[in-house]
């Protein structure tokens, strides 16, 4: 049986897509998948870090809009889907150990610990369908690429040991489209809301748009403006500063596709 095309994957209901991912049959990015369903960034921490991180999310709701939190030791997000198992239902994960480079894997069952707490954080992939419905084209989708992401100079609000830069995702748009995109995305605070910045990237510490820190580069036309949204990769940048002994995250662009519709929250 031939592998499904990306267009065919985009038509799959979330439970079917997750089954495909769970079997290891798809390990690519999830931008453009799930259609109108919420996608979530993932952070998994040992319980000793959980309260601190929960407060960090509360202090930084633009970057870390919290969709759900698991019980200690549970790999399930009951609010997001009845059969979700965070150990296997994302296409790619990063396992971070203090003093070591992250390891990318497609299943974290062998790394799971009894005191792990999982956090689902809203993702801007969720509002991309609303932008498309408004007639706003998205370059990374047109090119079949992951979204472009950068570490910015915008500081997060600290919580105990947790402090660091805000990561932003970028989408290039023409001026009229940019105005409409701000109007559309401001309706979705649980998926990062309106952009944090538009225009000159140097004002938020980004030196070269062609060299993203995460994701894939996309070209910017002469008549386009770069728009920057807060991004759920922010926790990875912050946790890299303090280096817990062990934590797990999604690989940037490889999200959990939930059963919830993006406009339900």
Swiss-Prot record:
InterPro entries referenced in this protein's UniProt entry, alphabetically: D-Glu_cyclase, Putative_hydro-lyase, UPF0317
The name this protein goes by in its record: Putative hydro-lyase PA2116
Catalytic class of the enzyme: lyase
Molecular functions (GO terms): lyase activity
EC number: 4.2.1.-
Family in the record: Belongs to the D-glutamate cyclase family.
HAMAP family hit by this protein: Hydro_lyase (MF_01830)
Lyase as UniProt keyword: yes
